[in-house]
Regions:
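N-terminal glycine-/serine-/threonine-rich phosphate-binding loop
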Residues: 1-56, 72-80, 86-87, 93-94, ...
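ATP/nucleoside-binding phosphotransfer catalytic cores, i.e., glycine-rich phosphate-binding loops
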Residues: 2-7, 24-25, 264-362
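Ligand-binding beta-strand-loop-alpha-helix segment within the catalytic cores
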Residues: 3-24, 84-208
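Glycine-rich anion-binding loop/nest that anchors nucleotide
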Residues: 55-59, 208-214, 249-294, 314-317, ...
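Histidine-anchored nucleotide/phosphate-binding helix
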Residues: 67-95, 413-436
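Active-site beta-strand->loop->alpha-helix modules in alpha/beta enzyme cores, enriched
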Residues: 167-184, 343-648, 654, 686-687, ...
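Gly/Ser/Thr-rich active-site loops/lids in small-molecule metabolic enzymes
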Residues: 222-252, 296-311, 636
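A conserved mid-domain beta-alpha-beta active-site/ligand-binding segment of alpha/beta enzyme cores
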Residues: 661-723
Length: 772
């Protein structure tokens, strides 16, 4: 269908250089997340100018960060020339300032039950960022306040549903006890409330402007995969993908797995025939679900297809999210080697055909690859040679080099490319440094650290922690022999002594407590441990911890990182914990500060003087937000250093892991992974990253620890290259390293200049966008 775009949409669509979308729901592609936020903001303001008393429904979570920032910035600086220019350049009429105070707001969804005053409730988010942030009238807001949802017996929800476990099957079955009867009546009361909420939305005339994200399973609001397209407001259980995504909000998968949600339905969104429905998505992790949602006919397995009958439906996408769509660039002359290889890989997959059997006819018969210039008999041969070169590079790893391995979080480096590190650390001629940029405290659950403190208390009382009796321990002894802690712990791993491992971990916990709180005696130590345990018992899961608790959790993760690289024989003096200050556990992460965040990186690079710097490379800015902010920080440090000294010989190795990955065309180095390397990864991860062993914050792709997902990714990447090069390339190879290959690690190699050019696009889009 030919899309009828508004003036704002036309302005952004023209910049994408794409033909008119052929999907049933039109889409617009932008370069990055900040531009995605600008597009959604300007389209929202454009609609409010035409509908100043309309009904809006806006999203929660991290996705709308730049939508919120842009909207607040534009409205706060409406009369400034730079804002007027931004609006005019992007199709928004500036003759009249939008006023939002007469709009009616409908909350999309909420966890149930949840205290609305908690910072991780969507009710809190809506109040803070929309009612207060946008100046909406609270009297015009229809919100989901869990504490005000009635139950028929006027008891607390926790008394009715112990541990907040709600069994919705009680709707349909007989009860077996008095408590189940109470629960059944309460569920019916919630159902009644949901029905009344739906009616209130209908009384407003339905939703006029809906903006929402799309979940990994395709969920719109909390309408998960399989939801009826005629669904209305209701309480429901979610699926694993949604629970994994919600784990960071609720304090772990252990909580989100049992927490229900209240959500408006798909028909609630589309009931108003004039509704504007915008779904926005960023990053390649969303590319597959975006493709299915736009290119498959109406299907309950893809909730967004329910929107296809609404003429006002749109998808706003970053390049990464639009990556798999069958789109054709207007400028057919812009075929880089990488782009040619990317499309030929897609063609092999679509045809399920080995690359060596790809013919010029196959290439010419495909709508997209037929546009590749100068197609001939050598096209596929050249393609295969370029793929082989990426693999051959793995045989030429550096010797007598200094490598600075950097990670945004603890475990990022291990999960990114540990088989490469196996080879780098084998040579005593190489010097390896490891630096983790943030303290990583958000991935440690309250329950885990509380249990660890209880074990520590038991060991102190049973006199199993002898070091605290040394006369100088509370003065400076606590800060000594940390390397010995690590060595002894790994000794206990070798001897399979789990008690010894726990004791070693508690030793490090004691050192951290004395360090953080400047404790001076055993009595003070015991009191402080009891105080912290009491704190954890009184706070809710997912609550933002105070700085001292954040530091305690972070120091636990730092010990885990030291264990990991000591596992590989690295001296802990070569392991750096930078604790960059922008990482605070806020809903929206701060922009890195030059003095606070950049200078420590400059100091580290000057101190280590590396030949190679590794980093988590997210060129679109749509991976985990911390990854992106760390990339910004390292880029700025290198930009400053490049002005002070020659950095031309320094190589950058970009890696990705469980959150985001390279495709086979953009990777420069493909490193073989043997079954032995996979076993080492799993053993290292489960023995060293103890707080992550239970996978409290899993990826939506796998219900288990990250090491298992990493192995799956490596195997999938190898499977792609088996298709391209043929299986015989591997099992008949003359090199035993390749014959033993069952997975592949992808890396991208850049010069500092090339990296800065990549990072500058990101840096300019944020720093130069006026909204920091």
């Amino acid at each position: 269908m030919k899309a009828k775009f508004t003036n704002v949409e036309k302005a952004f669509f023209s910049k994408s250089h794409l033909n008119n979308p052929r999907t049933k729901i039109p889409y617009i592609q932008v370069d990055n997340i900040p531009n995605l936020g600008l597009l959604t903001s300007l389209r929202f303001l454009e609609w409010t100018l035409e509908n100043p008393r309309g009904v809006i429904s806006l999203p929660t979570g991290k996705t709308p960060e730049y939508f919120i920032k842009w909207t607040q910035y534009i409205l706060s600086n409406w009369d400034k020339p730079e804002v007027e220019q931004i609006c005019k350049d992007n199709g928004l009429n500036t003759n009249k300032k939008p006023k939002l105070n007469h709009l009616k707001f409908v909350q999309i969804d909420e966890f149930y039950p949840i205290n609305p005053l908690q910072h991780n409730s969507f009710y809190y988010f809506v109040q803070k960022f929309y009612v207060e942030g946008f100046g909406l009238n609270p009297k015009n807001s229809l919100l989901i306040n869990s504490s005000e949802i009635p139950n028929s017996i006027n008891e607390s929800i926790e008394d009715i549903f112990p541990n907040y476990k709600i069994d919705l099957s009680l709707r349909y079955r007989d009860t077996n006890s008095d408590i189940e009867e109470k629960q059944k009546q309460t569920i019916f009361a919630i159902d009644q409330w949901c029905s009344e909420y739906e009616n209130k939305i209908a009384d407003l005339g339905g939703i006029g402007f809906f903006l929402g994200g799309i979940g990994p399973d395709g969920h719109i609001a909390f309408n998960v995969r399989g939801s009826d397209h005629n669904s209305t407001t209701r309480i429901l259980e979610t699926n694993f993908e949604t629970q994994a995504t919600s784990a960071s909000d609720l304090g772990g998968i252990e909580i989100s797995r049992n927490r229900l949600v209240i959500t408006i339905g798909l028909s609630t969104i589309t009931k108003n025939s004039d509704v504007i429905v915008i779904i926005f998505a960023a990053g390649r992790s969303k590319a597959k679900i975006v493709k299915d949602s736009l290119e498959i006919k109406k299907d309950i397995n893809f909730p967004a297809t329910a929107l296809s009958d609404s003429i006002g439906s749109r998808f706003y996408l970053t390049k990464g999210a639009a990556y798999l769509l069958n789109k054709i660039n207007i400028n057919t002359k812009d075929w880089s080697t990488e782009e040619i290889n990317r499309e030929l890989i897609k063609l092999c997959k679509n045809l399920n055909k080995f690359g060596s059997r790809l013919t010029p006819k196959d290439i010419m018969d495909n709508q997209i690859t037929s546009s590749i210039p100068n197609i001939n008999n050598n096209t596929s041969t050249r393609f295969l040679d370029q793929m082989k070169q990426k693999i051959q590079k793995s045989s030429d790893l550096p010797m007598n080099n200094t490598i600075l391995h950097t990670g945004p979080h603890h475990d990022d480096i291990l999960l990114g490319y540990s088989p490469v590190i196996n080879h780098l650390v084998r040579s005593a001629e190489n010097t390896n440094y490891f630096a983790v940029m943030t303290s990583g405290f958000t991935s440690v659950t309250n329950k885990y650290i509380s249990n660890l403190l209880s074990k520590t208390l038991e060991l102190i009382k049973s006199e199993k922690i002898q070091m605290i009796k040394y006369p100088d321990f509370f003065d400076n002894g606590f800060n000594l022999k940390k390397a010995k802690d690590v060595y002894h712990y790994l000794d206990k791993v070798a001897s399979q002594n789990t008690f010894g491992q726990t004791r070693g971990l508690c030793h490090r916990m004691v050192r951290s407590l004395v360090d953080i709180y400047s404790l001076k005696s055993i009595d003070e130590l015991v009191v402080k441990i009891n105080d912290i345990i009491q704190y954890f018992s009184s706070c809710y899961d997912g609550e933002k911890n105070p700085p001292d608790i954040q530091k305690l959790k972070g120091m636990l993760r730092e010990f885990e990182e030291e264990l990991t690289w000591a596992h590989y024989g690295v001296d802990i003096k070569n392991i750096y914990h930078l604790r960059l200050g922008f990482y605070k556990g806020d809903i929206f992460t701060e922009t890195p500060d030059r003095e606070r965040d950049i200078k420590p990186i400059i100091k580290l690079i000057n101190k280590t003087n590396p030949d190679i710097i590794t980093l988590a490379l997210d060129p679109e800015g749509s991976g985990p937000d911390t990854h992106y902010k760390v990339l910004q920080s390292i880029a700025e440090a290198l930009r400053i250093l490049s002005k002070e000294k020659d950095m031309s010989k320094v190589k950058i190795w970009g890696y990705r892991n469980v959150w985001y990955r390279f495709d086979s065309a953009e990777a420069d180095i493909m490193f073989p992974v043997s079954l032995n390397s996979m076993a080492v990864l799993r053993d290292s991860f489960l023995n060293c990253y103890l707080s992550q062993k239970d996978a409290s914050f899993p990826s939506y792709e796998l219900d288990g620890p990250f090491c298992d997902l990493t192995q799956k990714i490596w195997v999938d990447q190898h499977r792609t290259m088996e298709l391209i090069l043929g299986k015989d390339f591997w099992y008949q190879n003359n090199d035993p390293h390749f014959r033993a290959t069952h997975g592949l690690v992808y890396l991208k190699e850049l010069t500092v200049k090339e990296f800065l050019n990549t990072a500058r696009t990101l840096e300019e889009s944020i720093e130069g966008s006026l909204i920091k």
